[in-house]
Amino acid sequence: MTDSLDRRLVATLYADGRADVRSLAAETDTAATTVQDRLRALEDDGIITGYAARLGYDRLGYETAIFQLAVDHENIDAVTARLREKPAFVTVYETSGHHTVVAVGKFGDENAIGSCLQELHADAAVRAVDVVRVDVVSEADCPIAPE
């Protein structure tokens, strides 16, 4: 991000992804045309990659599970690509240490978690997999503080 205005725009959009240019302009005390230009630049630079609703998965009956996978480095790209294709996984990380891939998933029930676990155990590129069910305490908070 290039400056304070960009940070304020991103933080404001994170809090309300449905905010229109006029409300963003009012919130940041900036001309609407400037806000529109900045948003376009943030999109072009890949800083803003899209606009989406944040869901209360627990209210929809979903369970959150974290899958920790031990994958050899030469297989990481292929494994993370397969995980990204699965709608249940909302976040996939490449990490250092024993667990080289960590994926956070939202599952409709225990059976869905178990099926995914079995599939990953059968994947020849995955040396080991651990899964932990978690209760979400906080999710989707914006780490970018407006300046």
Model-derived regions: residue spans:
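A compositional/biophysical signature of low hydrophobicity enriched in polar/charged and small residues
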Residues: M1-E147
